[in-house]
Regions:
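Short active-site oxyanion
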Residues: 68-70, 97-101, 442-443
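Conserved N-terminal alpha-helix of the aminotransferase class I/II PLP-enzyme fold
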Residues: 34-79
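Conserved C-terminal alpha-helix-loop-beta "cap" of PLP-dependent enzymes
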Residues: 298-452, 457-463
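Structural signal for conserved beta-strand scaffold positions within catalytic alpha/beta enzyme cores
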Residues: 72, 124-126, 220, 345, ...
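Conserved PLP-enzyme active-site core in the AAT-like
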Residues: 2-10, 76-306, 322
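Flexible, glycine-rich loop/tail regions that form catalytic "lids" or insertion modules at the edges
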Residues: 428, 467-470
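N-terminal "arm"/small-domain region of PLP-dependent enzymes with the aminotransferase-like
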Residues: 1-52
Length: 471
């Protein structure tokens, strides 16, 4: 597959043209990549008005992912999330009342800032009480979604879309096919934050990408699981989305810099050639190595590794339940760090390890050696550790559902605010989302009144300060 952006920039660098244009480094500098860092010079195209090499590269990505249309972002899935919500708002019927989105509660804070910028409300889908033991996960069954939509309809409210995160930070995958069928039966678009799942289209057994499963709008963080520089992402449109080219590019431009990174654009462009060539085989090898390691861990400490297989699990994320080692997630992460392995995420319960198709045999061997050593040295699984308490999330959900909303998300985010100790926040209006990052998933959402039920979760996830609206 051709790489028009990469080819153009390399030719330009080789020509040794005198650069009387931005950037100021003029192709020289300490990093070594400066000669490939350009701006929108003649022939380089423009990301938000693409007609040349960028449009050609995006057409290649569209073909690879099998979408109706795929667009590039150099500012991560956060930009794509805001853009696809803007598009969904534009598609809603005129004079439909104040806009409301139905969304699973484990959403990234980018959704909340989109709600503040675009001024819509969010009706939350909470996990069932027996499935609510972790901040990152919010399983939604089709029946529960259908019931929630019926309840909103009975109140005279029709959401402009349904929003899900799949896969989530712990590797849980929603039933996108079943949930999209419910959405479409109600005449609603399904929007999916697939930031962690760009690779799902390239599985040997067939695509598990949300667009192929019925999602209408979807974002992928290419940089999370593909060989792409940080910030590279995709906005995908499904076949049912009736939005013209200009509307989509305008939506992205609304939330993006007018100076998109050409290093990231080249990275996205180069990835197309990799995805079209050897990526599936390399991905399969990575999955095989990860499966072998998972089976070894099951033999050493049953219950340590969450399954890699099954309809609701993604196959490229190793999530470890640290309680099987008598440790907290943070303790297990530190033990790995001391042995030369850095994990993606750790909380009181779990750690998340994210290999990719680019992970080498030597890197897997290093991880294997480290985990074997920790398993040999760790205490028994019955040592007291901070465990997940589904009741804590259920209690928070009940408290928040029962309270009246005094501020919209937009009003709370833009209001004068102050930082106070989290333990003193009860009864105050949350201004900025109360999150730890990663995973950037809020315990409290802007505009909500902090109930006592939030305090145990603040403590569990290390949130010591809360931004509240000034009184």
């Amino acid at each position: 597959m051709n790489t028009p952006v990469v080819d153009f920039v390399r030719r330009y660098a080789q020509q040794r043209t005198t650069r009387m244009h931005m950037p100021g480094h003029k192709g020289r500098g300490p990093l070594g990549c400066e000669e490939l860092d350009i701006t929108e010079i003649a022939g380089a195209d423009e990301l938000y008005e693409a007609e040349g090499i960028i449009a050609q590269s995006e057409a290649n990505a569209t073909q690879l992912f099998g979408t109706a249309r795929t667009y590039y972002s150099t500012e991560g899935s956060s930009q794509c999330i805001r853009a696809m919500l803007h598009l969904a708002l534009q598609m809603r019927p005129a004079k439909a009342g104040r806009p409301v989105l139905l969304a699973a509660r484990n959403a990234h804070k980018a959704l909340l800032y989109a709600a503040a910028l675009l001024d819509f409300d969010i009706q939350w889908l909470w996990p069932a009480p027996d499935a609510a033991g972790a901040l990152c996960t919010c399983p939604v069954e089709p029946e529960a979604l259908s019931s929630a939509l019926d309840e909103l309809s009975a109140e005279g409210r029709t959401p402009f879309g349904v929003y899900l995160t799949s896969p989530d930070y712990l590797g849980f995958v929603q039933d996108v096919a079943g949930l999209s069928a419910v959405c479409h039966a109600h005449g609603l678009p399904l929007l999916v934050d697939n930031a962690h799942g760009a690779y799902l289209h390239f599985l040997k057994e067939g695509s598990r990408h949300p667009i192929q499963l019925g999602a209408d709008l979807c974002c992928d963080s290419a940089h999370k699981t593909l060989p792409v520089l940080t910030g590279g992402a995709y906005l995908h449109l499904g076949p049912s989305v009736q939005a013209d080219e200009a509307a989509v590019r305008n939506a992205l431009a609304l939330f993006g810099s007018t100076s998109p990174s050409y290093l990231i654009l080249q990275s996205l462009d180069a990835a197309n050639a990799v995805l079209a060539d050897s990526f599936r085989e390399k991905l399969d090898i990575c999955r095989w190595r990860l499966g072998m390691l998972c089976r070894e861990l099951d033999a050493l400490r049953p219950g340590l590794a969450l399954p890699l297989t099954g309809a609701h699990r993604e196959p490229l994320k190793l999530t470890l339940d640290a309680a099987a080692l008598g440790l907290s997630g943070q303790q297990l992460a530190q033990a790995l760090r001391e042995r030369g392995v850095e994990c993606e995420y750790a909380d009181p319960l779990y750690i998340v390890l994210m290999p990719s198709a680019e992970s080498s045999a030597a890197e897997f061997a290093c991880l294997q050696t480290a985990l074997h050593a920790i398993c040999d040295e760790a205490p028994a699984a019955d040592v007291s550790v901070t465990a997940g308490d589904p009741a804590a999330f259920a209690a928070l959900a009940g408290a928040l559902e029962a309270q009246p909303r005094r501020f919209t998300i937009r009003e709370a985010v833009l209001a004068p605010q102050e930082m106070i100790p989290a333990a003193e926040a009860v009864g105050r209006i949350c201004a900025a989302p109360a999150v730890s990052c990663p995973p950037a998933i809020p315990i409290m959402v802007s505009g909500e009144t902090v109930p006592p039920e939030a305090l145990p979760l603040f403590a569990r996830y290390g949130i010591e300060k809360a931004a509240v609206v000034k009184e």
